[in-house]
Protein backbone atom coordinates (compact mmCIF):
# COMPACT_ATOMS: atom_id res chain seq x y z
CA UNK A 1 0.00 0.00 0.00
CA UNK A 2 2.86 2.30 0.78
CA UNK A 3 4.38 1.61 -2.60
CA UNK A 4 1.15 2.44 -4.37
CA UNK A 5 0.85 5.69 -2.46
CA UNK A 6 4.36 6.66 -3.43
CA UNK A 7 3.58 6.05 -7.06
CA UNK A 8 0.48 8.19 -6.80
CA UNK A 9 2.47 11.07 -5.36
CA UNK A 10 5.17 11.07 -7.99
CA UNK A 11 3.03 10.25 -11.02
CA UNK A 12 3.58 13.03 -13.57
CA UNK A 13 0.55 15.21 -14.30
CA UNK A 14 -1.45 14.91 -17.50
CA UNK A 15 0.10 16.45 -20.57
CA UNK A 16 -2.59 19.14 -20.87
CA UNK A 17 -1.61 20.71 -17.50
CA UNK A 18 1.43 23.04 -17.46
CA UNK A 19 3.59 22.68 -14.39
CA UNK A 20 5.32 26.00 -13.72
CA UNK A 21 6.15 25.36 -10.10
CA UNK A 22 8.66 22.69 -9.13
CA UNK A 23 7.81 20.06 -6.54
CA UNK A 24 8.38 21.35 -3.00
CA UNK A 25 8.34 25.06 -4.07
CA UNK A 26 5.65 27.21 -2.46
CA UNK A 27 3.62 29.46 -4.81
CA UNK A 28 4.21 33.18 -4.26
CA UNK A 29 1.28 35.60 -4.10
CA UNK A 30 1.03 37.93 -7.08
CA UNK A 31 2.82 41.24 -6.68
CA UNK A 32 0.39 44.17 -6.74
CA UNK A 33 1.41 47.51 -8.17
CA UNK A 34 -0.53 49.22 -5.41
CA UNK A 35 1.71 47.58 -2.81
CA UNK A 36 4.81 48.73 -4.67
CA UNK A 37 3.65 52.34 -4.85
CA UNK A 38 2.44 52.29 -1.25
CA UNK A 39 5.84 51.14 -0.01
CA UNK A 40 8.15 52.98 -2.38
CA UNK A 41 6.34 56.15 -3.44
CA UNK A 42 8.87 58.36 -1.67
CA UNK A 43 11.71 56.82 -3.64
CA UNK A 44 9.78 57.37 -6.87
CA UNK A 45 9.17 61.02 -5.99
CA UNK A 46 12.84 61.58 -5.18
CA UNK A 47 13.88 59.95 -8.47
CA UNK A 48 11.20 61.23 -10.85
CA UNK A 49 10.60 64.82 -9.70
CA UNK A 50 14.11 66.10 -10.56
CA UNK A 51 13.82 64.42 -13.97
CA UNK A 52 10.33 65.71 -14.74
CA UNK A 53 11.31 69.27 -13.78
CA UNK A 54 14.46 69.23 -15.95
CA UNK A 55 12.80 70.92 -18.98
CA UNK A 56 12.45 74.11 -16.91
CA UNK A 57 16.23 74.32 -16.77
CA UNK A 58 17.24 72.67 -20.05
CA UNK A 59 14.83 74.47 -22.39
CA UNK A 60 15.62 77.89 -20.94
CA UNK A 61 19.02 79.44 -20.48
CA UNK A 62 20.00 81.58 -17.51
CA UNK A 63 20.56 81.34 -13.78
CA UNK A 64 16.96 82.37 -13.09
CA UNK A 65 15.63 79.16 -14.66
CA UNK A 66 18.19 77.05 -12.83
CA UNK A 67 16.98 78.60 -9.59
CA UNK A 68 13.35 78.04 -10.61
CA UNK A 69 14.12 74.37 -11.26
CA UNK A 70 15.59 74.04 -7.79
CA UNK A 71 12.62 75.85 -6.23
CA UNK A 72 10.14 73.48 -7.92
CA UNK A 73 12.04 70.38 -6.81
CA UNK A 74 12.39 71.59 -3.23
CA UNK A 75 8.76 72.71 -3.05
CA UNK A 76 7.54 69.25 -4.09
CA UNK A 77 9.94 67.55 -1.67
CA UNK A 78 8.77 69.83 1.14
CA UNK A 79 5.06 69.28 0.48
CA UNK A 80 5.30 65.51 -0.01
CA UNK A 81 8.07 65.01 2.59
CA UNK A 82 9.63 62.47 0.24
CA UNK A 83 12.87 63.51 1.92
CA UNK A 84 12.92 64.71 5.52
CA UNK A 85 12.11 68.43 5.64
CA UNK A 86 15.50 69.28 7.09
CA UNK A 87 17.40 67.29 4.45
CA UNK A 88 15.51 69.02 1.63
CA UNK A 89 16.47 72.34 3.20
CA UNK A 90 20.17 71.49 2.81
CA UNK A 91 19.93 71.12 -0.98
CA UNK A 92 20.84 74.79 -1.74
CA UNK A 93 24.22 74.24 -0.06
CA UNK A 94 24.96 71.66 -2.76
CA UNK A 95 23.02 73.06 -5.70
CA UNK A 96 23.68 76.81 -5.60
CA UNK A 97 27.48 76.62 -6.08
CA UNK A 98 27.17 73.92 -8.77
CA UNK A 99 24.51 75.88 -10.67
CA UNK A 100 26.48 79.11 -10.45
CA UNK A 101 23.82 80.92 -8.42
CA UNK A 102 25.79 81.69 -5.25
CA UNK A 103 29.11 80.64 -3.76
CA UNK A 104 29.34 78.14 -0.92
CA UNK A 105 30.38 80.87 1.49
CA UNK A 106 27.41 83.09 0.59
CA UNK A 107 24.97 80.19 0.84
CA UNK A 108 26.21 78.80 4.15
CA UNK A 109 26.10 82.20 5.83
CA UNK A 110 22.34 82.27 5.29
CA UNK A 111 21.95 79.21 7.53
CA UNK A 112 23.04 81.11 10.65
CA UNK A 113 21.64 84.61 10.37
CA UNK A 114 20.70 86.92 13.23
CA UNK A 115 17.07 85.82 12.94
CA UNK A 116 18.05 82.18 13.36
CA UNK A 117 20.26 82.91 16.35
CA UNK A 118 17.43 84.82 18.00
CA UNK A 119 15.04 81.94 17.38
CA UNK A 120 17.35 79.22 18.70
CA UNK A 121 18.29 81.38 21.68
CA UNK A 122 14.61 81.97 22.41
CA UNK A 123 14.01 78.22 22.41
CA UNK A 124 16.87 77.74 24.88
CA UNK A 125 15.48 80.37 27.24
CA UNK A 126 12.05 78.73 26.98
CA UNK A 127 13.69 75.41 27.84
CA UNK A 128 15.17 77.03 30.95
CA UNK A 129 11.60 77.92 31.97
CA UNK A 130 10.53 74.34 31.29
CA UNK A 131 13.57 72.91 33.11
CA UNK A 132 12.60 74.53 36.43
CA UNK A 133 8.83 73.91 35.98
CA UNK A 134 8.06 77.62 36.10
CA UNK A 135 5.56 77.19 33.25
CA UNK A 136 3.60 74.57 35.23
CA UNK A 137 3.46 76.81 38.27
CA UNK A 138 2.12 79.69 36.18
CA UNK A 139 -0.46 77.49 34.42
CA UNK A 140 -1.80 75.91 37.60
CA UNK A 141 -1.92 79.23 39.44
CA UNK A 142 -3.95 80.92 36.71
CA UNK A 143 -6.39 77.98 36.61
CA UNK A 144 -6.82 78.27 40.38
CA UNK A 145 -7.69 81.95 39.98
CA UNK A 146 -10.07 81.50 37.03
CA UNK A 147 -12.04 78.64 38.57
CA UNK A 148 -12.71 74.96 37.93
CA UNK A 149 -16.28 74.69 36.65
CA UNK A 150 -16.31 73.04 33.18
CA UNK A 151 -16.60 76.31 31.26
CA UNK A 152 -14.25 78.29 33.52
CA UNK A 153 -11.69 75.50 33.49
CA UNK A 154 -11.83 75.34 29.71
CA UNK A 155 -11.40 79.11 29.45
CA UNK A 156 -8.49 79.08 31.89
CA UNK A 157 -6.71 76.25 30.07
CA UNK A 158 -7.08 77.96 26.70
CA UNK A 159 -5.88 81.36 27.89
CA UNK A 160 -2.90 79.92 29.80
CA UNK A 161 -1.92 77.81 26.80
CA UNK A 162 -2.21 80.81 24.48
CA UNK A 163 -0.01 82.97 26.72
CA UNK A 164 2.67 80.33 27.26
CA UNK A 165 2.74 79.55 23.54
CA UNK A 166 3.74 83.14 22.85
CA UNK A 167 7.08 82.42 24.54
CA UNK A 168 7.75 78.67 24.37
CA UNK A 169 7.29 76.24 21.50
CA UNK A 170 3.74 75.22 20.61
CA UNK A 171 4.57 71.53 20.95
CA UNK A 172 6.16 71.92 24.40
CA UNK A 173 3.21 73.99 25.60
CA UNK A 174 0.69 71.39 24.41
CA UNK A 175 2.71 68.52 25.87
CA UNK A 176 2.74 70.28 29.25
CA UNK A 177 -1.01 70.90 29.34
CA UNK A 178 -2.13 67.39 28.29
CA UNK A 179 -1.27 65.66 31.61
CA UNK A 180 -3.01 68.43 33.56
CA UNK A 181 -6.22 67.91 31.57
CA UNK A 182 -5.94 64.14 31.86
CA UNK A 183 -5.58 64.28 35.66
CA UNK A 184 -8.64 66.53 36.02
CA UNK A 185 -10.81 64.41 33.70
CA UNK A 186 -9.81 61.14 35.37
CA UNK A 187 -10.77 62.50 38.79
CA UNK A 188 -14.09 63.81 37.47
CA UNK A 189 -14.81 60.43 35.89
CA UNK A 190 -13.94 58.65 39.15
CA UNK A 191 -16.52 60.83 40.92
CA UNK A 192 -19.14 59.98 38.27
CA UNK A 193 -19.35 63.58 37.04
CA UNK A 194 -18.39 62.98 33.40
CA UNK A 195 -16.92 60.37 31.07
CA UNK A 196 -13.59 60.64 29.28
CA UNK A 197 -14.37 58.16 26.48
CA UNK A 198 -17.45 56.66 24.90
CA UNK A 199 -18.42 53.11 25.77
CA UNK A 200 -16.69 50.39 23.69
CA UNK A 201 -18.43 49.53 20.44
CA UNK A 202 -20.16 46.12 20.28
CA UNK A 203 -21.37 44.06 17.38
CA UNK A 204 -23.77 41.10 17.36
CA UNK A 205 -22.04 37.82 16.46
CA UNK A 206 -24.14 34.66 16.63
CA UNK A 207 -26.71 36.36 18.81
CA UNK A 208 -24.06 37.46 21.33
CA UNK A 209 -22.45 40.83 21.96
CA UNK A 210 -18.78 40.98 20.98
CA UNK A 211 -16.43 43.83 21.85
CA UNK A 212 -14.74 45.36 18.82
CA UNK A 213 -11.16 45.39 20.14
CA UNK A 214 -9.71 46.77 16.92
CA UNK A 215 -11.30 50.17 17.59
CA UNK A 216 -10.05 51.81 20.79
CA UNK A 217 -12.56 53.99 22.66
CA UNK A 218 -12.84 57.52 21.33
CA UNK A 219 -13.23 60.65 23.48
CA UNK A 220 -16.51 62.25 24.47
CA UNK A 221 -17.42 65.77 23.41
CA UNK A 222 -16.28 67.29 26.70
CA UNK A 223 -12.90 65.57 26.37
CA UNK A 224 -12.60 66.79 22.78
CA UNK A 225 -13.41 70.32 23.89
CA UNK A 226 -10.56 70.41 26.39
CA UNK A 227 -7.89 68.78 24.24
CA UNK A 228 -8.69 70.54 20.98
CA UNK A 229 -8.91 73.81 22.90
CA UNK A 230 -5.28 73.63 24.04
CA UNK A 231 -4.09 72.47 20.60
CA UNK A 232 -5.76 75.39 18.86
CA UNK A 233 -4.68 77.85 21.58
CA UNK A 234 -1.06 76.74 21.11
CA UNK A 235 -1.16 77.47 17.39
CA UNK A 236 -2.92 80.81 17.88
CA UNK A 237 -0.69 81.88 20.76
CA UNK A 238 2.38 81.33 18.62
CA UNK A 239 1.14 84.13 16.35
CA UNK A 240 1.54 86.67 19.14
CA UNK A 241 5.31 87.17 19.18
CA UNK A 242 8.22 86.91 16.77
CA UNK A 243 9.68 84.01 18.78
CA UNK A 244 6.31 82.31 19.22
CA UNK A 245 6.75 80.00 16.25
CA UNK A 246 9.29 79.30 13.52
CA UNK A 247 6.86 80.56 10.87
CA UNK A 248 7.08 84.10 12.25
CA UNK A 249 10.87 84.01 12.08
CA UNK A 250 10.65 82.71 8.52
CA UNK A 251 8.73 85.65 7.07
CA UNK A 252 10.67 88.10 9.23
CA UNK A 253 13.97 86.76 7.89
CA UNK A 254 12.84 86.61 4.26
CA UNK A 255 11.26 90.08 4.40
CA UNK A 256 14.30 91.73 5.97
CA UNK A 257 16.69 89.98 3.58
CA UNK A 258 14.69 90.98 0.50
CA UNK A 259 13.89 94.54 1.62
CA UNK A 260 16.89 95.68 3.62
CA UNK A 261 16.05 99.35 3.11
CA UNK A 262 12.45 99.05 4.26
CA UNK A 263 11.34 101.72 6.71
CA UNK A 264 8.87 99.27 8.29
CA UNK A 265 10.99 96.72 10.11
CA UNK A 266 9.71 93.59 11.83
CA UNK A 267 10.95 94.40 15.32
CA UNK A 268 9.64 92.69 18.44
CA UNK A 269 7.31 95.38 19.91
CA UNK A 270 5.80 96.42 16.56
CA UNK A 271 5.03 92.83 15.65
CA UNK A 272 3.33 92.27 19.01
CA UNK A 273 1.37 95.50 18.61
CA UNK A 274 0.19 94.23 15.22
CA UNK A 275 -0.60 90.61 16.08
CA UNK A 276 -1.63 90.39 19.76
CA UNK A 277 -5.07 92.08 19.38
CA UNK A 278 -6.05 89.75 16.54
CA UNK A 279 -4.60 86.79 18.46
CA UNK A 280 -6.85 87.56 21.42
CA UNK A 281 -9.90 87.79 19.15
CA UNK A 282 -9.04 84.47 17.41
CA UNK A 283 -8.64 82.73 20.74
CA UNK A 284 -11.79 84.11 22.37
CA UNK A 285 -13.96 83.34 19.34
CA UNK A 286 -12.45 79.86 19.08
CA UNK A 287 -13.26 79.30 22.76
CA UNK A 288 -16.86 80.37 22.14
CA UNK A 289 -17.14 78.08 19.10
CA UNK A 290 -15.78 75.06 20.99
CA UNK A 291 -18.18 75.79 23.86
CA UNK A 292 -21.10 75.96 21.42
CA UNK A 293 -20.05 72.89 19.44
CA UNK A 294 -19.01 70.58 22.28
CA UNK A 295 -20.54 71.93 25.51
CA UNK A 296 -23.93 73.19 24.35
CA UNK A 297 -23.40 76.91 24.92
CA UNK A 298 -26.68 78.77 24.14
CA UNK A 299 -28.35 75.36 23.74
CA UNK A 300 -29.57 74.67 27.30
CA UNK A 301 -31.74 71.69 26.32
CA UNK A 302 -28.98 69.89 24.45
CA UNK A 303 -27.40 66.74 25.83
CA UNK A 304 -24.00 68.45 26.00
CA UNK A 305 -25.33 71.40 28.02
CA UNK A 306 -27.01 69.08 30.51
CA UNK A 307 -23.78 67.15 30.95
CA UNK A 308 -21.91 70.40 31.57
CA UNK A 309 -24.57 71.35 34.13
CA UNK A 310 -23.88 68.09 35.97
CA UNK A 311 -20.18 68.83 35.65
CA UNK A 312 -20.56 71.96 37.76
CA UNK A 313 -21.00 69.63 40.71
CA UNK A 314 -17.47 68.40 40.05
CA UNK A 315 -15.89 71.84 40.24
CA UNK A 316 -14.74 71.13 43.78
CA UNK A 317 -13.22 67.84 42.64
CA UNK A 318 -11.33 69.55 39.81
CA UNK A 319 -10.16 72.26 42.19
CA UNK A 320 -8.75 69.63 44.54
CA UNK A 321 -6.80 68.07 41.68
CA UNK A 322 -5.39 71.44 40.56
CA UNK A 323 -4.58 72.42 44.15
CA UNK A 324 -2.78 69.14 44.72
CA UNK A 325 -0.77 69.53 41.54
CA UNK A 326 0.22 73.03 42.59
CA UNK A 327 1.08 71.83 46.09
CA UNK A 328 3.30 69.10 44.64
CA UNK A 329 5.48 71.79 43.08
CA UNK A 330 6.39 73.07 46.53
CA UNK A 331 7.31 76.67 47.33
CA UNK A 332 8.81 78.80 44.57
CA UNK A 333 12.55 78.11 44.45
CA UNK A 334 15.43 80.49 43.88
CA UNK A 335 15.94 78.57 40.62
CA UNK A 336 12.50 79.58 39.33
CA UNK A 337 12.88 83.16 40.57
CA UNK A 338 16.16 83.64 38.70
CA UNK A 339 14.78 82.18 35.48
CA UNK A 340 11.69 84.39 35.72
CA UNK A 341 13.85 87.49 36.23
CA UNK A 342 16.06 86.60 33.24
CA UNK A 343 13.02 85.95 31.06
CA UNK A 344 11.43 89.29 31.96
CA UNK A 345 14.78 90.99 31.40
CA UNK A 346 15.01 89.50 27.89
CA UNK A 347 11.52 90.70 26.94
CA UNK A 348 12.24 94.19 28.30
CA UNK A 349 15.46 94.28 26.26
CA UNK A 350 13.45 93.40 23.15
CA UNK A 351 11.05 96.28 23.73
CA UNK A 352 13.68 98.88 24.58
CA UNK A 353 16.31 98.05 21.95
CA UNK A 354 15.03 100.62 19.43
CA UNK A 355 11.52 101.61 20.51
CA UNK A 356 11.32 104.60 18.15
CA UNK A 357 9.55 106.90 20.60
CA UNK A 358 12.82 107.38 22.54
CA UNK A 359 16.46 106.36 22.22
CA UNK A 360 16.92 102.69 22.95
CA UNK A 361 19.86 101.00 24.62
CA UNK A 362 21.15 99.84 21.21
CA UNK A 363 21.30 103.48 20.05
CA UNK A 364 23.18 104.56 23.17
CA UNK A 365 25.83 101.81 23.18
CA UNK A 366 27.55 102.46 19.85
CA UNK A 367 26.94 102.98 16.15
CA UNK A 368 26.96 99.28 15.32
CA UNK A 369 23.72 97.56 14.39
CA UNK A 370 22.70 95.51 17.44
CA UNK A 371 19.85 93.07 16.87
CA UNK A 372 17.66 91.02 19.21
CA UNK A 373 19.99 88.05 18.98
CA UNK A 374 22.34 89.85 21.39
CA UNK A 375 20.04 90.03 24.47
CA UNK A 376 18.72 86.54 23.68
CA UNK A 377 22.14 84.91 23.75
CA UNK A 378 23.15 87.05 26.73
CA UNK A 379 20.30 85.51 28.73
CA UNK A 380 21.24 82.02 27.50
CA UNK A 381 24.81 82.52 28.71
CA UNK A 382 23.55 83.81 32.06
CA UNK A 383 21.45 80.66 32.44
CA UNK A 384 24.70 78.68 32.44
CA UNK A 385 26.61 81.13 34.63
CA UNK A 386 24.10 81.47 37.46
CA UNK A 387 23.69 78.59 39.95
CA UNK A 388 20.34 76.87 40.46
CA UNK A 389 20.80 77.25 44.23
CA UNK A 390 23.21 78.94 46.60
CA UNK A 391 23.88 76.06 48.97
CA UNK A 392 27.61 76.51 48.33
CA UNK A 393 27.48 79.66 50.46
CA UNK A 394 27.24 77.38 53.47
CA UNK A 395 30.96 76.89 53.13
CA UNK A 396 31.29 80.49 54.34
CA UNK A 397 29.03 80.13 57.38
CA UNK A 398 28.30 77.56 60.02
CA UNK A 399 24.55 77.98 59.70
CA UNK A 400 22.04 76.84 57.13
CA UNK A 401 22.45 73.07 57.13
CA UNK A 402 25.00 70.70 55.61
CA UNK A 403 27.33 71.85 52.87
CA UNK A 404 26.83 70.41 49.35
CA UNK A 405 28.90 67.36 48.49
CA UNK A 406 29.04 68.02 44.74
CA UNK A 407 29.13 70.87 42.23
CA UNK A 408 26.18 73.24 42.11
CA UNK A 409 24.13 72.88 38.90
CA UNK A 410 23.41 75.86 36.67
CA UNK A 411 19.93 77.12 35.77
CA UNK A 412 19.94 74.72 32.83
CA UNK A 413 22.25 71.99 31.56
CA UNK A 414 23.62 71.59 28.07
CA UNK A 415 22.49 67.96 28.04
CA UNK A 416 18.88 69.10 28.48
CA UNK A 417 19.25 71.66 25.69
CA UNK A 418 20.96 69.18 23.40
CA UNK A 419 18.10 66.71 23.68
CA UNK A 420 15.24 69.22 23.57
CA UNK A 421 16.22 71.84 20.96
CA UNK A 422 14.82 71.06 17.47
CA UNK A 423 18.16 71.51 15.71
CA UNK A 424 16.68 70.62 12.35
CA UNK A 425 14.83 73.94 12.32
CA UNK A 426 18.17 75.66 11.72
CA UNK A 427 18.33 74.02 8.30
CA UNK A 428 14.60 74.40 7.59
CA UNK A 429 14.67 78.14 8.23
CA UNK A 430 18.09 78.54 6.61
CA UNK A 431 16.91 76.74 3.48
CA UNK A 432 14.09 79.24 3.10
CA UNK A 433 16.47 82.17 3.54
CA UNK A 434 18.85 80.65 0.99
CA UNK A 435 16.07 80.20 -1.58
CA UNK A 436 14.91 83.78 -1.08
CA UNK A 437 18.42 85.17 -1.56
CA UNK A 438 19.11 82.83 -4.48
CA UNK A 439 15.98 84.01 -6.28
CA UNK A 440 17.22 87.58 -6.02
CA UNK A 441 20.82 86.83 -7.01
CA UNK A 442 19.84 84.65 -9.98
CA UNK A 443 17.23 87.01 -11.42
CA UNK A 444 14.32 84.68 -10.73
CA UNK A 445 12.74 87.44 -8.67
CA UNK A 446 12.68 89.69 -11.72
CA UNK A 447 11.20 86.87 -13.82
CA UNK A 448 8.38 86.22 -11.34
CA UNK A 449 7.70 89.94 -11.03
CA UNK A 450 7.26 90.34 -14.78
CA UNK A 451 4.95 87.31 -14.89
CA UNK A 452 2.66 88.62 -12.14
CA UNK A 453 2.05 92.14 -13.45
CA UNK A 454 -1.35 91.02 -14.76
CA UNK A 455 -2.67 90.66 -11.20
CA UNK A 456 -2.54 94.44 -10.85
CA UNK A 457 -6.13 94.69 -12.14
CA UNK A 458 -7.50 92.94 -9.03
CA UNK A 459 -8.44 94.98 -5.94
CA UNK A 460 -5.92 94.73 -3.12
CA UNK A 461 -8.51 93.37 -0.71
CA UNK A 462 -9.35 90.52 -3.09
CA UNK A 463 -5.67 89.63 -3.42
CA UNK A 464 -5.28 89.66 0.35
CA UNK A 465 -8.23 87.31 0.85
CA UNK A 466 -6.93 84.92 -1.82
CA UNK A 467 -3.46 84.90 -0.26
CA UNK A 468 -4.87 84.09 3.19
CA UNK A 469 -7.08 81.32 1.80
CA UNK A 470 -4.21 79.74 -0.15
CA UNK A 471 -1.86 79.85 2.85
CA UNK A 472 -4.45 78.32 5.20
CA UNK A 473 -5.29 75.59 2.68
CA UNK A 474 -1.69 74.60 1.98
CA UNK A 475 -0.59 74.59 5.61
CA UNK A 476 -3.29 72.06 6.46
CA UNK A 477 -1.36 69.39 4.57
CA UNK A 478 2.29 70.26 5.09
CA UNK A 479 4.79 71.87 7.44
CA UNK A 480 3.97 75.49 8.29
CA UNK A 481 7.58 76.60 7.85
CA UNK A 482 7.95 74.77 4.55
CA UNK A 483 4.84 76.44 3.14
CA UNK A 484 6.07 79.83 4.35
CA UNK A 485 9.43 79.20 2.67
CA UNK A 486 7.61 78.56 -0.61
CA UNK A 487 4.99 81.32 -0.72
CA UNK A 488 6.66 84.26 1.06
CA UNK A 489 9.37 84.85 -1.60
CA UNK A 490 6.72 84.62 -4.33
CA UNK A 491 4.51 87.15 -2.53
CA UNK A 492 7.47 89.49 -2.10
CA UNK A 493 7.99 89.63 -5.86
CA UNK A 494 4.26 89.77 -6.59
CA UNK A 495 3.85 92.82 -4.35
CA UNK A 496 6.57 94.63 -6.30
CA UNK A 497 5.03 93.66 -9.62
CA UNK A 498 1.55 94.92 -8.77
CA UNK A 499 2.89 97.90 -6.80
CA UNK A 500 1.45 97.35 -3.33
CA UNK A 501 3.24 97.46 0.00
CA UNK A 502 5.08 94.13 0.49
CA UNK A 503 3.98 93.86 4.14
CA UNK A 504 0.35 94.08 3.05
CA UNK A 505 0.54 90.51 1.72
CA UNK A 506 3.60 88.99 3.42
CA UNK A 507 2.61 89.59 7.04
CA UNK A 508 -0.94 88.13 6.80
CA UNK A 509 0.37 85.19 4.76
CA UNK A 510 2.99 84.43 7.39
CA UNK A 511 0.38 84.48 10.15
CA UNK A 512 -2.02 82.38 8.07
CA UNK A 513 0.62 79.65 7.79
CA UNK A 514 0.18 78.99 11.52
CA UNK A 515 -3.58 78.46 11.28
CA UNK A 516 -3.85 74.71 10.79
CA UNK A 517 -6.74 73.09 12.65
CA UNK A 518 -8.13 70.23 10.57
CA UNK A 519 -5.68 67.32 10.58
CA UNK A 520 -3.26 65.72 13.06
CA UNK A 521 -0.46 66.12 10.49
CA UNK A 522 -1.14 69.85 10.11
CA UNK A 523 0.90 70.94 13.12
CA UNK A 524 2.62 69.35 16.16
CA UNK A 525 -0.05 70.43 18.72
CA UNK A 526 -2.75 68.69 16.66
CA UNK A 527 -0.66 65.53 16.44
CA UNK A 528 0.07 65.57 20.18
CA UNK A 529 -3.54 65.81 21.34
CA UNK A 530 -4.71 63.35 18.68
CA UNK A 531 -2.27 60.75 19.98
CA UNK A 532 -2.76 61.57 23.66
CA UNK A 533 -6.56 61.45 23.65
CA UNK A 534 -7.09 59.10 20.68
CA UNK A 535 -8.97 61.78 18.73
CA UNK A 536 -10.35 60.52 15.45
CA UNK A 537 -9.32 62.41 12.32
CA UNK A 538 -12.93 63.04 11.32
CA UNK A 539 -13.67 64.62 14.71
CA UNK A 540 -10.71 66.98 14.37
CA UNK A 541 -11.57 67.78 10.75
CA UNK A 542 -15.13 68.77 11.68
CA UNK A 543 -14.08 70.72 14.77
CA UNK A 544 -11.47 72.61 12.75
CA UNK A 545 -14.06 74.18 10.45
CA UNK A 546 -15.07 76.79 13.02
CA UNK A 547 -11.56 77.99 13.98
CA UNK A 548 -10.56 78.09 10.31
CA UNK A 549 -13.47 80.34 9.34
CA UNK A 550 -12.93 82.49 12.44
CA UNK A 551 -9.23 83.04 11.81
CA UNK A 552 -9.63 83.74 8.08
CA UNK A 553 -12.32 86.39 8.62
CA UNK A 554 -10.64 87.93 11.66
CA UNK A 555 -7.22 88.11 10.03
CA UNK A 556 -8.69 89.66 6.88
CA UNK A 557 -10.62 92.29 8.85
CA UNK A 558 -7.71 93.14 11.15
CA UNK A 559 -5.30 93.55 8.25
CA UNK A 560 -7.67 96.07 6.67
CA UNK A 561 -8.25 97.99 9.91
CA UNK A 562 -5.82 97.50 12.79
CA UNK A 563 -2.98 96.81 10.39
CA UNK A 564 -3.29 100.36 9.04
CA UNK A 565 -2.98 101.73 12.57
CA UNK A 566 0.30 99.88 13.18
CA UNK A 567 1.64 100.36 9.64
CA UNK A 568 -0.03 103.53 8.26
CA UNK A 569 1.64 103.19 4.85
CA UNK A 570 0.23 99.75 4.01
CA UNK A 571 -2.22 101.20 1.48
CA UNK A 572 0.54 102.97 -0.46
CA UNK A 573 3.51 101.84 -2.51
CA UNK A 574 6.45 103.41 -0.62
CA UNK A 575 9.50 104.94 -2.28
CA UNK A 576 11.87 102.27 -1.01
CA UNK A 577 9.62 99.62 -2.59
CA UNK A 578 9.61 101.53 -5.89
CA UNK A 579 13.40 101.28 -5.97
CA UNK A 580 13.23 97.52 -5.45
CA UNK A 581 10.49 97.23 -8.07
CA UNK A 582 12.58 99.10 -10.62
CA UNK A 583 15.52 96.81 -9.95
CA UNK A 584 13.37 93.68 -10.12
CA UNK A 585 11.37 94.59 -13.21
CA UNK A 586 14.16 96.32 -15.07
CA UNK A 587 12.24 99.61 -15.30
CA UNK A 588 12.93 103.09 -14.06
CA UNK A 589 11.29 104.29 -10.90
CA UNK A 590 8.23 106.39 -11.42
From Swiss-Prot:
Keyword Membrane: yes
Inducers of expression: Completely inhibited by DIDS. Modest but significant inhibition by phloretin or furosemide.
InterPro entries xrefs: Na/sul_symport_CS, SLC13A/DASS
GO annotation terms (biological process): citrate transport; determination of adult lifespan; pyruvate transport; regulation of triglyceride storage; succinate transport; transmembrane transport
Domain of life: Eukaryota
Additional observations: The life-extending effect of mutations is likely caused by an alteration in energy balance caused by a decrease in transport function.
Biological role: Cation-independent electroneutral transporter (not associated with membrane depolarization) of a variety of tricarboxylic and dicarboxylic acid-cycle intermediates. There is also small, but detectable, transport of monocarboxylics. Transport is through the epithelium of the gut and across the plasma membranes of organs involved in intermediary metabolism and storage. Affinity for substrates is citrate > succinate > pyruvate. Fumarate, a-ketoglutarate, and glutarate are also transported, but not lactate. Transport mechanism that is not coupled to Na(+), K(+), or Cl(-).
Protein known as: Protein I'm not dead yet
Organism: Drosophila melanogaster
Amino acid sequence: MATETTKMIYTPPPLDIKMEIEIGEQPQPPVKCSNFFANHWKGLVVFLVPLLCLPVMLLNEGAEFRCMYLLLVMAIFWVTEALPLYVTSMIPIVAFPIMGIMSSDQTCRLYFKDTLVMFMGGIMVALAVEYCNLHKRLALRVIQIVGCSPRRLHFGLIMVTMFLSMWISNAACTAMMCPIIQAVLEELQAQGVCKINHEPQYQIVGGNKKNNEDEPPYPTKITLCYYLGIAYASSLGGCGTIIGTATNLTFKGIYEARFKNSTEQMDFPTFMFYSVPSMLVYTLLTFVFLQWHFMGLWRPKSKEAQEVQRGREGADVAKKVIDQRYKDLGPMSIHEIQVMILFIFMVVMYFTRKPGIFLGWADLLNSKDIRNSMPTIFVVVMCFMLPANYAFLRYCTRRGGPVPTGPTPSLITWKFIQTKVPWGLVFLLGGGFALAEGSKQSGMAKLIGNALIGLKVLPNSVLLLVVILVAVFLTAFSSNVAIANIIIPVLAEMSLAIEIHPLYLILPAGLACSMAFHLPVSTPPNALVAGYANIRTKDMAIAGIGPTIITIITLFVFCQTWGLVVYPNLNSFPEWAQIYAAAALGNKTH
